[in-house]
Curated annotation (Swiss-Prot):
Belongs to the universal ribosomal protein uL2 family. Residues 28-54, 221-274 are annotated as: Disordered. One of the primary rRNA binding proteins. Required for association of the 30S and 50S subunits to form the 70S ribosome, for tRNA binding and peptide bond formation. It has been suggested to have peptidyltransferase activity; this is somewhat controversial. Makes several contacts with the 16S rRNA in the 70S ribosome. Keywords: Ribonucleoprotein, Ribosomal protein, RNA-binding, rRNA-binding. GO terms for cellular component: large ribosomal subunit. GO terms for molecular function: rRNA binding; structural constituent of ribosome; transferase activity. Residues 39-49 have a biased composition (Polar residues). Part of the 50S ribosomal subunit. Forms a bridge to the 30S subunit in the 70S ribosome. One of its GO terms (biological process) is cytoplasmic translation. The keyword Ribosomal protein applies. This is Large ribosomal subunit protein uL2. InterPro entries: NA-bd_OB-fold, Rib_uL2_dom2, Ribosomal_uL2, Ribosomal_uL2_bac/org-type, Ribosomal_uL2_C, Ribosomal_uL2_CS, Ribosomal_uL2_dom3, Ribosomal_uL2_RNA-bd_dom.
Length: 274
């Protein structure tokens, strides 16, 4: 993995910082694990914008990732590491002994030729997936399930990880990167190690067009809009004079957005403020 700063041969290249990984596969992805992915432009089935700042971008195929890691007792070998345009993490194509191939998230340190396994009997080794009741306290894991059999939901982006800090009966306590500590059933699965490609956060796109290639549209300030478009819009100066709000009038500074009270009981400690 190398961090490359481009020479200023043009204004668009002057500030570009790239993350180069020579171990990534340079050919085409494995076709049977691809699915068509169509653009929405941030619109729902009524044609209304439900997510702002989305539109355009290069065409992509969705890679079917195995988040469940439920192929127990069958060893697999890593064939290659690949780039995935749909996520910040890299992915690994693994070949199981019975001939099946699957994509998984590539943990830090995994390379072509390594062997991995899933299930209760899997060893404590980076890339292996097993229930958290079988993982030692203090271990670093990723792709963590929140419900047994549902598939990993926590710690899936580049460089992400979760630490198992305690085990109490049928629950384990996890410390998330945000500082939050929460309980999860110990039968939930997790993959050992942390997600690779942690250098992703160091990249600099260098120009607006690089964001447009990725399907990201500009973010316009509310104060730069007209009154019809945003509560902050209009006026002769830049002063708003009220508490800042979203385009729909909801407070933006410190308002709680979590509404799932049913699972509040599993949160041992709230995330820390930045």
């Amino acid at each position: 993995m190398a961090i490359v700063k481009c020479k200023p041969t043009s204004p668009g290249r002057r500030h570009v910082v790239k993350v180069v990984n020579p171990e990534l596969h340079k050919g085409k992805p494995y076709a049977p694990l691809l699915e068509k992915s169509s653009k929405t432009g941030g619109r729902n089935n009524n044609g209304r914008i439900t997510t702002r700042h989305i539109g355009g971008g290069h065409k992509q195929h969705y890679r079917l990732i195995d988040f469940k890691r439920n192929k127990d007792g069958i060893p697999a070998v890593v064939e290659r590491l690949e780039y995935d345009p749909n996520r910040s993490a890299n992915i690994a194509l693994v070949l199981y002994k019975d001939g099946e191939r699957r994509y998984i998230l590539a943990p830090k340190g995994l390379k072509a030729g390594d062997q991995i396994q899933s299930g209760v009997d899997a060893s404590i080794k980076t890339g292996n997936a097993l229930p958290m009741r079988n993982i030692p306290v203090g271990s670093t894991v990723h792709n963590v399930e929140m419900k047994p059999g549902k598939g990993g939901q926590l710690a899936r982006s580049a460089g992400a990880y979760v630490q198992i800090v305690a085990r109490d009966g049928s629950y384990v306590t996890l410390r998330l990167r945000s500082g939050e500590m929460r309980k999860v059933l110990s039968d939930c699965r997790a993959t050992l190690g942390e997600v690779g490609n942690a250098e992703h956060m160091l990249r600099v796109l260098g120009k607006a067009g690089a964001s447009r290639w990725r399907g990201i549209r500009p973010t316009v300030r509310g104060t730069a809009m007209n009154p019809v478009d945003h509560p902050h819009g209009g006026g002769e100066g830049r002063n708003f004079g009220k508490h800042p709000v979203t385009p729909w009038g909801v407070q933006t500074k410190g308002k709680k957005t979590r509404s799932n009270k049913r699972t509040d009981q599993f949160i041992v400690r709230r995330r820390t403020k930045k």
